[in-house]
Regions:
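A solvent-exposed, acidic/Ser-Thr-rich amphipathic alpha-helical stretch
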Residues: 24-75
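Short beta-strand segments enriched in hydrophobic/aromatic residues
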Residues: 31, 72, 84-86, 123
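Low-complexity, intrinsically disordered terminal/linker segments enriched in charged
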Residues: 117-137
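Exposed beta-sheet edge and beta->alpha loop/turn motif
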Residues: 83-113
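Short, solvent-exposed coil/turn segments at beta-strand boundaries
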Residues: 45, 74-76, 109-116
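Short, low-complexity N-terminal intrinsically disordered segments enriched in polar/charged residues
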Residues: 1-33, 135-137
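Short solvent-exposed loop/turn micro-motifs enriched in small/polar/acidic residues
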Residues: 10, 63-64, 100-103
Length: 137
């Protein structure tokens, strides 16, 4: 059964806004102390690693963005569907148009006590990996 939990959905949308603003302070404030980030390969990172994790990603993809097309919520679980993209910049490199990428994404946010306890990503990483391989060759 699908229900609308406005408060949890609003927290998830604030998290998206902080990502799009590359606001690591804002992201950190929205994470619970037991926050877990889970990437599309199932790798898990705790809240303590995520400030530097996001900073590193925003350095690697300085124009990273996510666009949410649909939100579905049930209780404190929010599912967001959309796309993400940006331009991969190799270490010491510069932004080049040929390194732009985009992919379809689904995100799952678990919201507890007004904070994001889990941010899980489901996507095909091949578009950015292709750019990374090309830059390395």
């Amino acid at each position: 059964m699908q229900t609308k939990n406005v408060a949890a959905a609003e927290i998830a949308q604030k998290f998206v806004k902080a990502i799009n603003a590359h606001d690591t302070d804002g992201l950190t404030k929205l994470m619970s102390s037991d926050h877990v980030f889970v990437d599309s390969l199932g790798n898990r990172a705790p809240a303590s690693a995520m400030r530097s994790g996001w900073q590193g990603y925003f350095t690697m993809v300085p124009d990273y963005w996510i666009k949410v097309d649909q939100i579905v919520s049930e209780g404190n679980v929010i599912i967001l569907f959309g796309s993400a993209g940006g331009t991969f910049v190799p270490k010491g490199g510069t932004m080049k148009p040929e390194n732009k990428w985009e992919t379809s994404v689904a995100w799952r946010a678990l919201v507890k006590e007004g904070r994001v306890a889990e941010w899980r990503i489901y996507c095909d990483n091949e578009p950015i990996r292709e750019k990374m391989r090309a830059a390395a060759s």
